[in-house]
C-alpha cells in the first residue's frame, strides 16, 4: 500500500509526498500542523484504481 500526503500551501502550490507506511504519513501530517505556510494537508491511501481520503488537516 502507498500513502500520499497532499500539501496545499498559501501561495497555491500543491505538493504530493509518498510514504510506504501509515505511520510515516501520520508523522509527517502532524508536522504540517505547525507550519504557518500550509492551508490544508490531505492524507490519502493510494490504490491502483482509486484513492481513499484518510484525513484532512486545515
PLM features: residue spans?
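Short, surface-exposed linear segments at secondary-structure transitions and domain or protein termini
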Residues: 23-32
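Short, mixed-charge low-complexity intrinsically disordered segments
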Residues: 32-58
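A short, exposed loop/beta-hairpin motif centered on an aromatic-Gly-Thr core
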Residues: 12-23
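Serine/proline-rich low-complexity intrinsically disordered segments, especially terminal tails, linkers
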Residues: 6, 23, 37-38
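Short aromatic-glycine-(Arg/Gly/Cys) micro-motifs in beta-strand/loop hairpins
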Residues: 1-14, 46
Amino acid at each position: 500500500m502507498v500513502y500520499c500526503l497532499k500539501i496545499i500551501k498559501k501561495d497555491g502550490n500543491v505538493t504530493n509526498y509518498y510514504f510506504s507506511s501509515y505511520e510515516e504519513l501520520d508523522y509527517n501530517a502532524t508536522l504540517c500542523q505547525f507550519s504557518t505556510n500550509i492551508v490544508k494537508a490531505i492524507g490519502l491511501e493510494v490504490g491502483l484504481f482509486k484513492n481513499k481520503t484518510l484525513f484532512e488537516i486545515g
